[in-house]
């Protein structure tokens, strides 16, 4: 509130019937918003004044229009660039810059220049010796506040050329109200016990409640973008008839993480520079013994139609505990459970979304801890075609319809495919996941029937989240440098379901 300004407004109204806030701003040499703010303060004290909203429309220069006032119109600038001997049109366009095309067209229509085709190459020549820059002169009148004097045709043309813009200004016409006074009486904000006891409240004026005020935003928790995207992925899996797998085993044995997946014990992914091994407890001891023996055999000497890897499989390696490197370890446990359930095998569709851990170098796109999204389908006679069809359906629900597949190698799937999608924003194909058909060497030792195949695919949760929220550096999504304002103000996640 501006105490002196409010009283000046009231004193002025005492001498006149009506006053526009725009006129008051000019009269008092104050910003119009300050006048409006003082008006609201006056209105808070009761019906001292009445205010009628009025709308004013006026013409103003755009940035391009101001440049024309300062430097000249596009057509005049093009005319000035044409020397007496003429100039090639391409050279003229290059010299004229971004507005040369418009300037050339207007200069031609005004009859200021012509294209001389009697020479090779054709030259642009001046057609008149002098010109009058009418556009500049008319825009100068607008700059002086005389835009209402322009003919309607010119106004429409200048708007089309984005030299002028129409601005709408709201003001208030003030008049004396039924409680008019030239001074403001202090309004009470609280009704006290003393006021009620001595009856003083009846003589005082109280400030009215503002029921339109937004108030202070409540302090509350906010969902991280990863959780928002995770919810969308989970809903898509549930819509497709999948069941969620329990993923609470962050610490896993090498047996379930590697050996059960037919990944040899000499595989480089099992080295310490790729995997976080656990010291306490360092080993696991409880395994299904008959299943463990079948896994040992298929690794060492083969079986189920396979030659195996032909190496000395060691229990000590399988016992080592680690932070799981993929949620496929969870899938292995679920498939073993499915193979040995009462009543025999039944077709199943599973999914999981949870954390995995890799001993990787941290950079803008890689973390040592991230989320893996995995889908698994077990049924009789599944083929690579079923996998491709399922992937098209899954990614269609994500709003991705352009997919390509590239052959790849995984120890536990054959055939295997990398999944690529076309990113319109980046205008290129990007890798979004991996997929394949689980090998018989992995499935048959579990006890699954020979005619049962399992198809699976996986992708990270971080990459689609970064794409969805326009984040380029993963450190801006996870870690100590995350802007909490981004978490608080981030929109809900609605993937473009096709």
Curated annotation (Swiss-Prot):
The keyword Cytoplasm applies. Its EC number is 6.1.1.20. Disruption phenotype: Lethal when homozygous. Keywords: Aminoacyl-tRNA synthetase, ATP-binding, Cytoplasm, Ligase, Magnesium, Metal-binding, Nucleotide-binding, Protein biosynthesis. L-phenylalanine binds at residues 328, 372-374, 412, 438. Its main location: cytoplasm. It catalyses: tRNA(Phe) + L-phenylalanine + ATP = L-phenylalanyl-tRNA(Phe) + AMP + diphosphate + H(+). One of its GO terms (molecular function) is magnesium ion binding. This is Phenylalanine--tRNA ligase alpha subunit.
């Amino acid at each position: 509130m501006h105490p002196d300004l409010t009283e000046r407004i009231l004193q002025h109204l005492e001498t006149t019937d009506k006053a526009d806030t725009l006129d008051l701003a000019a009269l008092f040499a104050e910003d119009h918003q300050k006048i409006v703010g003082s008006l609201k303060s006056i209105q808070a004290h009761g019906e001292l004044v009445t205010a009628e909203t009025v709308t004013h429309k006026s013409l103003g220069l755009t940035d391009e229009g101001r440049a024309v006032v300062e430097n000249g119109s596009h057509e005049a600038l093009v005319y000035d660039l044409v020397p007496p001997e003429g100039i090639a049109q391409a050279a003229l366009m290059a010299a004229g810059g971004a507005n040369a095309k418009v300037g050339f067209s207007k200069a031609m229509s005004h009859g200021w220049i012509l294209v001389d085709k009697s020479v090779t190459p054709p030259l642009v020549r001046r057609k008149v010796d002098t010109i009058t820059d009418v556009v500049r002169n008319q825009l100068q009148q607008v700059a002086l506040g005389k835009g209402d004097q322009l003919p309607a045709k010119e106004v429409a043309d200048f708007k089309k050329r984005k030299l002028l813009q129409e601005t709408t200004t709201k003001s208030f016409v003030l008049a004396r109200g039924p409680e008019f006074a030239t001074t403001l009486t202090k309004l009470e904000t609280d009704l006290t016990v003393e006021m009620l006891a001595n009856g003083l409240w009846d003589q005082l004026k109280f400030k009215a409640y503002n029921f339109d005020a937004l108030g202070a935003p409540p302090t509350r928790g906010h969902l991280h973008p990863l959780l928002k995207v995770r919810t969308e992925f989970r809903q898509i899996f549930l819509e497709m008839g999948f069941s969620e797998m329990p993923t609470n085993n962050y610490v896993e044995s090498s047996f379930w993480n590697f050996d059960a997946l037919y990944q040899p014990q000499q595989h480089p992914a099992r080295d310490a520079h790729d995997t976080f091994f656990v010291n306490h407890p360092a080993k696991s001891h409880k395994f299904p013994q008959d299943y463990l023996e079948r896994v040992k055999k298929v690794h060492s000497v083969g079986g189920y139609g396979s030659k195996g890897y032909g190496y000395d499989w060691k229990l000590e390696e399988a016992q080592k505990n680690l932070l799981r490197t993929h949620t496929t370890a969870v899938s292995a446990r679920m498939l073993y459970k499915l193979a040995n359930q009462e009543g025999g095998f039944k077709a199943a569709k599973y999914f999981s979304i949870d954390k995995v851990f890799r001993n990787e170098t941290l950079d803008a796109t890689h973390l040592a801890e991230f989320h893996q999204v995995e889908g698994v389908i077990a049924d009789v006679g599944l083929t690579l075609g079923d996998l491709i069809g399922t992937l098209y359906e899954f990614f269609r629900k994500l709003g991705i319809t352009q997919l390509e597949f590239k052959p790849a190698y995984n120890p536990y799937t054959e055939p295997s495919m990398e999944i690529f999608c076309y990113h319109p924003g980046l205008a290129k194909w990007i890798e979004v996941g991996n997929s394949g058909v689980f090998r018989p060497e992995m499935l048959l030792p579990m006890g699954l029937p020979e005619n049962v195949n399992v198809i699976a695919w996986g992708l990270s949760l971080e990459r689609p989240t970064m794409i969805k929220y326009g984040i380029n550096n993963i450190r801006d999504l996870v870690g100590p440098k995350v802007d909490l304002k981004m978490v608080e103000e981030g929109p809900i996640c609605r993937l473009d379901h096709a």
